[in-house]
């Protein structure tokens, strides 16, 4: 019997994702036993400050990566949207699981859609990406910072008198909140975060035993899509807390990547598209970044970082 230690954040959604990885591994390798090890990350500890004000380098990953490098765990399970595009030396992505619905969902107890929300409705989200795209589509809305796990955010919606909140469809579905009344926001209005809806497995570089184990649960179409999105984000030198979005779709070996860059207030927005192949998904990411940079994305992001720097001191 082989035993490996699987690292995860402590949140309900993170545990769900880790359990999915454990079940998939134990099904693929009948002689394998996995033990769950949970850790609190910096992002889990600071809940009263908007993410953009904290900084985003490894906000939800660093503690797990340190445990991985120290040998306290054998692999770490992450939401791919939380992972910086550059990993610590000695660590690699060993596998990416099948993607859940990557869309954002507008949740409203009254059943409002983005189009029918009242003028100046209060909508909760802390994501700069979501705020910028919502402000572009509905500049009248009052966008309110909202942090916490899915159940916490749903509770805060009622407590804080919010008309609606925006959540990731993947989290709602994985935690069986699919019955929550919500409208998937169309991609032409709100593109998701890079890697949204995908589960990543991080391992030590050179750990052949664990690499072989996790390779069995890798989903090549999702892995190619996420690699394209991350290459795009890396080429733009963006982090999780900037108004950058992307979504790659894969059919056979063909890959199509959509991307968006916006100012914090949503007044400036650039969108474009690039095509490529699953044989070299990063090339599509770099091409899309090149196209947007040629149209002024660099200047927009420079201004975003200057404004964010004011918050972070």
UniProtKB/Swiss-Prot annotation:
Protein's GO biological process: protoporphyrinogen IX biosynthetic process
Record field: catalytic activity: 4 porphobilinogen + H2O = hydroxymethylbilane + 4 NH4(+)
GO-annotated molecular function: hydroxymethylbilane synthase activity
Enzyme class: transferase
Record-listed E.C. numbers: 2.5.1.61
Modified residues (S-(dipyrrolylmethanemethyl)cysteine): 240
SUPFAM superfamilies per the UniProt record, alphabetical: Periplasmic binding protein-like II, Porphobilinogen deaminase (hydroxymethylbilane synthase), C-terminal domain
Pfam families found in the cross-reference section: Porphobil_deam (PF01379), Porphobil_deamC (PF03900)
Entry note: cofactor: Binds 1 dipyrromethane group covalently.
The protein's required cofactors: dipyrromethane
InterPro entries in UniProt: HemC (IPR000860), Porphobilin_deaminase_N (IPR022417), Porphobilinogen_deaminase_C (IPR022418), Porphobilinogen_deaminase_C_sf (IPR036803)
Cellular component GO terms, alphabetical: cytoplasm
Alphabetized UniProt keyword annotations: Porphyrin biosynthesis, Transferase
Keyword Transferase among record annotations: yes
Coiled-coil ranges from the UniProt annotation: none
Pathway the protein contributes to: Porphyrin-containing compound metabolism; protoporphyrin-IX biosynthesis; coproporphyrinogen-III from 5-aminolevulinate: step 2/4
Role: Tetrapolymerization of the monopyrrole PBG into the hydroxymethylbilane pre-uroporphyrinogen in several discrete steps.
Quaternary structure, from the entry: Monomer.
Further information: The porphobilinogen subunits are added to the dipyrromethane group.
Protein family: Belongs to the HMBS family.
Name of the protein in its database record: Porphobilinogen deaminase
The species this protein was found in: Moorella thermoacetica (strain ATCC 39073 / JCM 9320)
Gene: hemC
